[in-house]
Structure formats: C-alpha cells, structure tokens
C-alpha cells in the first residue's frame, strides 16, 4: 500500500483543537450567528423551524441552485452542484478528471489540500510560482512553458491563499491560453472573491471565460459561515453530472438546513449585506496588521493582501517556520501557520479577519515571542 499523504496543515490545526488563546491560524472571517442571518422576524424564524430535516436532493434544492447561478454570468441552475464545502469540491473534481501519471499544474503558493490530493492520486505535480520579489505576481511565462499534452488540469486560487493576491487580467488570460493550448481543465478556487480590501469590486469569476473552467466557492471564507459546511461547484452541466457520480460515494447530499438557509441569505440583497460586513471586518483587521508591521522595526514584513483576511508575513529571524509556530503556541497560546505548509520557509500565514482588539493582542504576543531570537 502506498503511504498516504495526510493534509499536514489541517492535521496540525487539529492538534490545537481550538484550545488556543488567540487563533490567528484560521483563514476565514469572524463567523456570523444564526440570529444575524435570520434576523428578529418571528415569521422568518418560524419558516426555518418548520423545515423537515429530511435528505436534501442530491443536486441540492432548485431554490439554492437558482440563487447560486444568479451569481455567475451565463450560468443556469444546471451548472451548479452544491457540496459539503470547497474541500469536498476539490476532492471530487480531482478524482473525476485525473488519473495516476497525469500532470496537474498549480499556481504556488496555493491552498495545499489540492497538492495532497494530487500526491495521493499519484499525479505529476508542477508548480508555477507567484514571485516573492514581485509582490506575488504570477510567473506567466513559466505557465506557458510547463504545460504539455499530459497536462489535464491547471489549479489556481484567486484571490490567493495564503498571499491574498488577486490575479490581473493579463495573468488570467495567460492561464486560459496555456489551458487552451493543451486542452486542459482549469479549476479555480474562488472562496475569497468578495473579500476585497483595496476596493469594492468583487473579484470576477473565471466561469464562462473558457469552456473548460470549473470554479468552486463556499460559505466558509468570504461569507463567514463555515459551520454550515456548504460549498458549490460551477461547471458545464455534463461535468456536474460526472462529479455527482463521485459525490454519491462521499456525502451523497448536503445538509437540508444548510441548503435552505443558504438559498435565503445568498439572495443578492442579503448577500451584499454579508459582503459589506466582511469587508468592514477585514479592512479594520488589515489596518491593525499594517500598523503592527510598521512598528516591528524590521522583525516582520509583508506584501499587503488585496483580498481575504489572511496575510503571508515574512519574519527576519533565524528559526524554521514550523518551529516558530510550535514554540509560539507553547509559549503564548497563539496559533498561526508556518510557511512550511506552503513550501516556503521564513514566512507565517497570519489571520486578521477577527475583531480588531483580538488581532492586536494576538500580534503583540507574536512580537514578544520573536524578540528572543537574533536577526
């Protein structure tokens, strides 16, 4: 039996088991409550209390699929497949389209779940770098050079995890051109679309810009509702049908309650309220992070993210990032993520998508810990 590649990032977070004093490792936003989602209207509350807790349809309810399709230009409900979070979406897509020996091209750094799935499927993994010395811009020439006839899928994350970088039009076009050249699929993780820091323009979905694009999203990041464990895949109808065949071996359906709630609060008027709240939270957190960096006297530096509630922070100390992470947690109860999880030592992924004072106090603990090491 081949050795199984565990998901190292999630494995480490599971060891903390939410016992940390300051959680700067989570990649989402301060979660919404049911009261915030439903409001104080007794009629609305009763409507949800009366939901029979039966199975949801395997394709999700028509109401949810229609609501989700309204978010994507040119999409219909047939292009939508609800799943149990973006993590299941990634797992299903790779298991549907790729076989041992196939090549997968990934922009990097990227959410490492896809890398782990690819390892377990025995795929040939090729990384195209976001360049550290160019504010995380994508090395688009490399994208064109690495694709071959064996390239079956190009996986991107836009906005990016862990850097918060948003692809430019030129970079998007380069990815599409590379995929078209070898007739490859594009898998676009778009879970941070809508969490923009520098402007109010929602990051444009790649869906519809090429006929072999599969996009995924979820409630967990921008929408600040990870506890409902709901995500969705947007793809050509024949593709969603193929993916459903695999889903029937995993979760079969999503949660009925999650389905009905999402169909309500993802209606455009409600959705925009959630996006406004998210942007308020992360912009305040980003200000705290930026001030902390400026006051760090060279101990830390960062290319400020354009979107998301996370930043990929460089530290100027002679200690491995995994050791930094572990020793920090043991010393002060602060959790953050080592750059090692993304294959880049010397960096830390730090969340700022929490209340300002919480983030500020957590960052102060990071500074106190770092001061004991020589630069």
What are these language model-derived features?
Residues 132-201:
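Active-site phosphate-binding strand-loop segment of PLP-dependent enzymes
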Residues 96-156:
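PLP-dependent aminotransferase-like
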Residues 102, 123, 181-184, 211:
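A short helix->loop->beta-strand "cap" motif at the edges of active sites that frequently abuts
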Residues 25, 263, 279-290, 301-314:
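Conserved glycine-rich beta-strand-loop-beta hairpin in the small C-terminal domain of fold type I
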Residues 121, 181-182, 332, 373:
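Helix C-cap/helix->beta junction micro-motif
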Residues 212-283, 290-291, 364:
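Conserved core segment of the aminotransferase class I/II
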Residues 74, 144, 327-336, 342-375:
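PLP-dependent enzyme catalytic core of the Aspartate aminotransferase-like
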Residues 2-85, 92, 268, 373-375:
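N-terminal small-domain helix-loop-helix segment of the aminotransferase-like
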């Amino acid at each position: 039996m081949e050795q199984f590649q565990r998901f190292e990032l999630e494995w480490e977070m599971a060891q903390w088991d939410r016992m940390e004093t300051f959680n700067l490792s989570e990649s989402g936003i301060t979660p919404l409550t049911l009261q915030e989602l439903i409001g104080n209207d007794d009629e609305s509350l009763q409507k949800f209390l009366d939901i029979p807790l039966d199975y949801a349809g395997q394709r999700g309810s028509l109401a949810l699929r229609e609501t989700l399709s309204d978010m994507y230009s040119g999409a219909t409900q047939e292009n939508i497949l609800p799943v149990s979070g973006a993590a299941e979406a990634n797992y299903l897509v790779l298991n549907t389209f790729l076989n041992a020996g196939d090549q997968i091209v990934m922009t990097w750094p990227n959410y490492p779940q896809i890398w782990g799935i690819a390892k377990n499927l025995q795929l040939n993994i090729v990384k195209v770098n976001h360049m550290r010395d160019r504010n995380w811009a994508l090395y688009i020439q490399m994208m064109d050079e690495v694709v071959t006839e064996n390239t079956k899928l190009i996986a991107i994350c836009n906005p990016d995890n862990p850097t918060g970088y948003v692809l430019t039009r030129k970079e998007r076009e380069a990815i599409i051109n590379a995929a078209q050249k070898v007739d490859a699929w594009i898998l676009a993780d778009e879970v941070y679309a809508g969490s923009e820091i520098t402007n109010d323009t929602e990051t444009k979905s790649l869906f519809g810009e090429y006929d072999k694009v599969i996009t995924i999203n979820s409630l967990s990041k921008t929408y600040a509702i990870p506890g409902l464990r709901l995500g969705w895949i947007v793809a050509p109808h024949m593709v969603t049908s193929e993916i459903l065949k695999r889903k029937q071996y995993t979760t079969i359906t999503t949660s009925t309650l999650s389905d009905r709630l999402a169909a309500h609060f993802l209606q455009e008027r409600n959705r925009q309220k959630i996006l406004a709240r998210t942007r308020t939270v992360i912009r305040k957190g980003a200000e705290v992070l930026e001030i902390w960096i400026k006051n760090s006297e060279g101990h830390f530096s960062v290319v400020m993210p354009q979107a998301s509630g996370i930043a990929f922070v460089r530290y100027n100390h002679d200690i491995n990032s995994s050791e930094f992470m572990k020793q920090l947690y043991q010393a002060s109860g602060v959790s953050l993520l080592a750059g090692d999880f993304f294959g880049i030592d010397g960096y830390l992924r730090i969340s700022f998508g929490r209340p300002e004072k919480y983030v500020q106090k957590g960052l102060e603990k990071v500074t106190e810990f770092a001061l004991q090491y020589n630069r």
